[in-house]
Amino acid sequence: MASAPPSESPGSDTVEQQDTAAGENVDPSVKLAELRGQAGVVMTINQVQRDSGGFVTVQAEIKNGGDQPANPAQWAGSESVIVRENLASVGGATLVDKVGKKRYYVLRDTDGRCLCTTKIRPLQPGDSTAVFMQFPAPPNTTTEVDFSVPTFATTSLKISG
């Protein structure tokens, strides 16, 4: 499990660690898709992997190419449980299987916490952060899904594995 280095919160003596557990190592130079967001923010998809446990994990990097700080709170979506438990996260992401006519939401644990990157700090201009989102896997016959995160464009992704 990989995680981002701890960072100090401004005006605080505590060190807060961003949760970026993402499973296996991901090659950041692999660019499967690029989603444009608001104000110059770009999400680059590095891996979309189906595993034997019945999950699909999407791993990506979000970079602020704009000139203002990017607020990650919008990426959590508007579902009340996700927002309450995972405000600074990518918990609002979805996969859509157009053939099977089904939408898949980011998985959650029994406390409502998403199986995704949480505690994302506002991205300053030029900053980037690695993120992951884990979903229930669509049927093995589904090899392509539409992927969306609030404020980003939707894109089609091929599932490997």
Q: What is the predicted function of each stretch?
A:
Residues 65-118:
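The feature marks short-to-medium sequence segments in extracytoplasmic or secretory-pathway proteins
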Residues 38-40, 51-57, 90, 128-130, ...:
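Extracytoplasmic
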Residues 26-27, 36-47, 111-114:
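N-terminal edge beta-strand
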Residues 63-68, 138-140:
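Short solvent-exposed strand-capping/beta-turn motif centered on an Asx-Ser/Thr pair
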Residues 4, 8, 26-32, 119-161:
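Surface-exposed edge beta-strand/loop patches
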Residues 1-37, 86-90:
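N-terminal low-complexity, Pro/Thr-rich disordered segments
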Residues 56-64:
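Short, well-ordered beta-strand segments enriched in hydrophobic/aromatic residues
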Residues 46, 51-52, 122-126:
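Immunoglobulin-like IPT/TIG beta-sandwich domains and homologous Ig-like subdomains
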